[in-house]
C-alpha cells in the first residue's frame, strides 16, 4: 500500500472556498491561507444563533498501546461515510503538535485513505495558531521577569512564580532550568522550566473561550504567581491581557480544511488529553453543530481521559450534548492488554485477546455511566484472523462494527456509520461530576467509578496545594486529572483493567483562567521528551521541495 503522503498527493482537492460554500459559509467570512486552508471569522457563528444544533458523535478509544488504535482515522472515515450515506456531516479535530510529529507518535491527520488534507501543512505550521499561543504564553514570562527586575510593585515572590515558559517541541532538557544568570543586567536568577505548548493554559483558554470578550477575560484571570504577602498575582495585575488578546485575535478563528473525500473538517486547538482537557475548540464544535446534521469529534487518548473530560467538563462549558460515543479498539491492542508483547501482536492469540477485552468492557461500562449510547468500532488490520474477529464479535457486549477506513476510506466505514445511526440518541447525557462537589469529591468519584481504584492518596505536596486552593476560593472548580494515558490507573505498567489499588495525587496546578484545577497523578510530565529514535529521523525534503517521511 502507498504511504500516507503518497496517497495525500494523489487526492483531488476542492478549493476551500467551495468546501465552505457547500456548508453555507459565505466567502466574506473566510480568510484563505492558500487554496485549501482558511480561517472562518468568529462573527459568522453569531449569525447562526437561531439555527438548531445537529447531533454530536464523540470518538474515543480503549487504553492506547504502542501498536496504535487509529482514532483519528476512524473519526475522519465515519464523517465521510455519513456523507456517503446521504447525511450531512463535518468532522472536528485538534491541531497536531510539532512535539509528537517529530517524536514517537508522528502526525495527527489520519492515515491511508482516511486523512485530512493538506496533511503536510496541517502537521507542521498550519495557520500559526500554536505559534501565536506560544508567543502569548512567553510574553507573560518575559513581563513577569521584567516586572521583578524593575521595582516589583506587585511584590512577586520569585520562588512562587507558577508560570513556566513554553515551546511546541518535546525537549526534556528544558523541564527544569535556571533563568536570569549572567549578572544584574539579565534579571534575577530563579528556577524556571518549559512545558509543551499543548499543555499551556492559554491553549486550554483558546479552546474554551466563546468569543474575544470571553478570551480576554479568561486571559486576565490567569494566576501566574504569589506575592510575598500571600496574594495571588494575575495577568490582569500585569495589565497585559489586551496584548495577549491581540496576539490571539486571529488564532481564535477556527480553521477549515477537507478530508481526502472532500468532507469539511474544522481543525482548531490542540490540548493534550493526558495533561489538559484534550479536544478541539468549543467554537469549532459549535460552528459545526450549526452547519450540519452530524458532527464527529474526537477526544484524546482513551475514554478515561479525553472522553471523561469531554462529557464532564467540555460539554458543560460549551452547552451542548453528546448523542453517541464511538469507542475504537483493535485486535492488536486487546492482545497487548492481554499480555502479549509488541513484536508478537501479529500472531493469532484468541485467548490473549479475550483476556484483553476486560479493558474494552471497563471503558464501555464507564461510558454508560453518562447515559449515552456506545458503539464499538473495531479497526481491522491485515494481521487480524477470522478466529479473532469471530471471537471478538461473540464477546463484545455493545453494538459494534468493523472499520477499514485506512484502506478503503468512507466505503470501509459504512458499517460503523449505519450502526451509529441505529443507536444515536436524542436524550441528554448525564455528567457524573456535580459542579457543587468539592475537589476531593470529584477526584474520589473519578478514581473509584472510572479508574476503579480502592481509594485516593494525597502526597504532602498535594495536601499543601489543596489548602492553597481552598484558601483562595477555588474549592469547587472543575477538576482535570493529568495522568498516564497507558493505563486506566495512575501507573503505566498496570495494563488491561486494574482494580483495587491506591490512586495517588502528587500535586495540583491552578488554571484559573481556563476555569479548572489540574490534579497531577503519577509521574506525568507537561514537557515530553523525544524517544531514542524519534520520527524526526524519517522526515526529509527531496530536490523538488516535497516533504517525505511524514505520516
UniProtKB/Swiss-Prot annotation:
Name of encoding gene: fhs
GO molecular function terms noted in the UniProt entry: ATP binding; formate-tetrahydrofolate ligase activity
UniProt: ATP binding residues: 65-72
Pathway terms, separated by semicolons: One-carbon metabolism; tetrahydrofolate interconversion
Enzyme class: ligase
Similarity comment text for this entry: Belongs to the formate--tetrahydrofolate ligase family.
Coiled coil region boundaries: none
Protein name, UniProt field: Formate--tetrahydrofolate ligase
InterPro entries registered for this protein in UniProt: Formate_THF_ligase, Formate_THF_ligase_CS, P-loop_NTPase
One Gene Ontology biological process: tetrahydrofolate interconversion
EC number: 6.3.4.3
A UniProt-annotated Pfam family: FTHFS
Lineage of the species this protein comes from: Bacteria, Thermotogati, Thermotogota, Thermotogae, Thermotogales
Catalytic activity field: (6S)-5,6,7,8-tetrahydrofolate + formate + ATP = (6R)-10-formyltetrahydrofolate + ADP + phosphate
Keywords: ATP-binding, Ligase, Nucleotide-binding, One-carbon metabolism
Amino acid at each position: 500500500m502507498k504511504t500516507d503522503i503518497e496517497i495525500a498527493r494523489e487526492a483531488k482537492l476542492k478549493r476551500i472556498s467551495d468546501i465552505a460554500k457547500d456548508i453555507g459559509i459565505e466567502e466574506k467570512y473566510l480568510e484563505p491561507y492558500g487554496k485549501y486552508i482558511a480561517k472562518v471569522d468568529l462573527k459568522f457563528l453569531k449569525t447562526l444563533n437561531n439555527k438548531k444544533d445537529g447531533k454530536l458523535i464523540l470518538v474515543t478509544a480503549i487504553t492506547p498501546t504502542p501498536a496504535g488504535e487509529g482514532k483519528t482515522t476512524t473519526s475522519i472515515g465515519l464523517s465521510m461515510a455519513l456523507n456517503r450515506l446521504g447525511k450531512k456531516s463535518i468532522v472536528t479535530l485538534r491541531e497536531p503538535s510539532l512535539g509528537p510529529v517529530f517524536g514517537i507518535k508522528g502526525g495527527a491527520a489520519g492515515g491511508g485513505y482516511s486523512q485530512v488534507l493538506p496533511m503536510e501543512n496541517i502537521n507542521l505550521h498550519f495557520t500559526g495558531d500554536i505559534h501565536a499561543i506560544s508567543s502569548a504564553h512567553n510574553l507573560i514570562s518575559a513581563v513577569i521577569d521584567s516586572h521583578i527586575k524593575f521595582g516589583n510593585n506587585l511584590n512577586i515572590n520569585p520562588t512562587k512564580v507558577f508560570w513556566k515558559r513554553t515551546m511546541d517541541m518535546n525537549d526534556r532538557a528544558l523541564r527544569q532550568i535556571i533563568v536570569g544568570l549572567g549578572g544584574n543586567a539579565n534579571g534575577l536568577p530563579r528556577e524556571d522550566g518549559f512545558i509543551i505548548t499543548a499543555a499551556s493554559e492559554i491553549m486550554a483558554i483558546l479552546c474554551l473561550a466563546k468569543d474575544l470578550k470571553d478570551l480576554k477575560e479568561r486571559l486576565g484571570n490567569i494566576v501566574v504567581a504569589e506575592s510575598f504577602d500571600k496574594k495571588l498575582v494575575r495577568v490582569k495585575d500585569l495589565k497585559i491581557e489586551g496584548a495577549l488578546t491581540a496576539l490571539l485575535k486571529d488564532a481564535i478563528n477556527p480553521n477549515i480544511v477537507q478530508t481526502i473525500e472532500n468532507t469539511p473538517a474544522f481543525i482548531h486547538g490542540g490540548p493534550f488529553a493526558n495533561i489538559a482537557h484534550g479536544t478541539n475548540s468549543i467554537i469549532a464544535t459549535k460552528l459545526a453543530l450549526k452547519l450540519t446534521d452530524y458532527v464527529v469529534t474526537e477526544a484524546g487518548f482513551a475514554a478515561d481521559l479525553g472522553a471523561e473530560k469531554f462529557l464532564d467538563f467540555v460539554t458543560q462549558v460549551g452547552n451542548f450534548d453528546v448523542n453517541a460515543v464511538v469507542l475504537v479498539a483493535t485486535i492488536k491492542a486487546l492482545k497487548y492488554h492481554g499480555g502479549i508483547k509488541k513484536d508478537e501482536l501479529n500472531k493469532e492469540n484468541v485467548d490473549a485477546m479475550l483476556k484483553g477485552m476486560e479493558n474494552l468492557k471497563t471503558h464501555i461500562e464507564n461510558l454508560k455511566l453518562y447515559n449515552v449510547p456506545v458503539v464499538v468500532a473495531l479497526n481491522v488490520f491485515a494481521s487480524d484472523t477470522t478466529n479473532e474477529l469471530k471471537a471478538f464479535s461473540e464477546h463484545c457486549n455493545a453494538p459494534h462494527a468493523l472499520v477499514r477506513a485506512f484502506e478503503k476510506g468512507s466505503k470501509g466505514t459504512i458499517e460503523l456509520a449505519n450502526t451509529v445511526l441505529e443507536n444515536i440518541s436524542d436524550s441528554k447525557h448525564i455528567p457524573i461530576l456535580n459542579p457543587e462537589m468539592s475537589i476531593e469529591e470529584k477526584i474520589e468519584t473519578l478514581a473509584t467509578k472510572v479508574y476503579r481504584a480502592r481509594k485516593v492518596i494525597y502526597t504532602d505536596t498535594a495536601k499543601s496545594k489543596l489548602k492553597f486552593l481552598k484558601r483562595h476560593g477555588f474549592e469547587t472548580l472543575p477538576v482535570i486529572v493529568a495522568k498516564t494515558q497507558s493505563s486506566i490507573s495512575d501507573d503505566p505498567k498496570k495494563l488491561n483493567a486494574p482494580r483495587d489499588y491506591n490512586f495517588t495525587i502528587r500535586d495540583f496546578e491552578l488554571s484559573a483562567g481556563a476555569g479548572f484545577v489540574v490534579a497531577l497523578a503519577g509521574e506525568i510530565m507537561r514537557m515530553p521528551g523525544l524517544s531514542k529514535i524519534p520520527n524526526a529521523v524519517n522526515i526529509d525534503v527531496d530536490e523538488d521541495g516535497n516533504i517525505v517521511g511524514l505520516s
